[in-house]
Amino acid sequence: MMLEPSIDKLLDQVDSKYSLVVLEAKRAHELRDKERPTKEFKAVKNTLRALEEIADGTVKIHPSPELKRETLVEKRELERLQAKMKEQLIKEQIAKEEAEEEAKQKNSRAAKAAAAE
C-alpha cells in the first residue's frame, strides 16, 4: 500500500523525517482539538489529514517556538474577549426584551384600570 501523499513530497516541505513526524503529530492533535483545517480533506483520520496539509504546504514548522507561543496566547485572549463581548450583547438584548415586556404589561394594566373606571 502506497502512502499518499508520498514521503518524498512530504520531505520537500520539511528539513528531516524527525521534523515531519513532530509536525504531523502536533497538527493531528490540533485537528483533534477542533482547530480549523486549512483545506478540504480526502482522509478521515487526523494524522492523514495533517500529512495532506503538510504536503500542500499549508502547515509549516514555526521558525520561533517563543513567537508561536505568543501568537497562540494572543489568539486565545482575542477569542476570550470575543466570547465576553458576545455574552455582553446577549445580556443587553435580554435586558432590553425584559424592559419591553415590562412596559407592555404596565400599559396593559393601565388600560384595564382605565376601562374599569
Curated annotation (Swiss-Prot):
Keyword Transferase listed: yes
Protein known as: DNA-directed RNA polymerase subunit omega
Subunit structure, interactors included: The RNAP catalytic core consists of 2 alpha, 1 beta, 1 beta' and 1 omega subunit. When a sigma factor is associated with the core the holoenzyme is formed, which can initiate transcription.
Keyword Transcription in annotation: yes
EC number(s) recorded for this UniProt protein: 2.7.7.6
Any one GO cellular component localisation term in the record: DNA-directed RNA polymerase complex
Known function: Promotes RNA polymerase assembly. Latches the N- and C-terminal regions of the beta' subunit thereby facilitating its interaction with the beta and alpha subunits.
Gene source species: Lactococcus lactis subsp. lactis (strain IL1403)
InterPro entries attached to this UniProt entry: DNA-dir_RNA_pol_omega, Pol_omega/Rpo6/RPB6, RPB6/omega-like_sf
Comp. bias intervals (Low complexity): 108-117
Family of this protein: Belongs to the RNA polymerase subunit omega family.
Keywords associated with the record: DNA-directed RNA polymerase, Nucleotidyltransferase, Transcription, Transferase
One GO MF term: DNA binding
Compositionally biased tracts (Basic and acidic residues): 96-105
Cross-referenced HAMAP family: RNApol_bact_RpoZ (MF_00366)
Gene: rpoZ
Reactions listed under catalytic activity: RNA(n) + a ribonucleoside 5'-triphosphate = RNA(n+1) + diphosphate
Region annotated Disordered, chain positions: 96-117
Top EC class, one word: transferase
Pfam short name (any one): RNA_pol_Rpb6
One record GO biological process: DNA-templated transcription
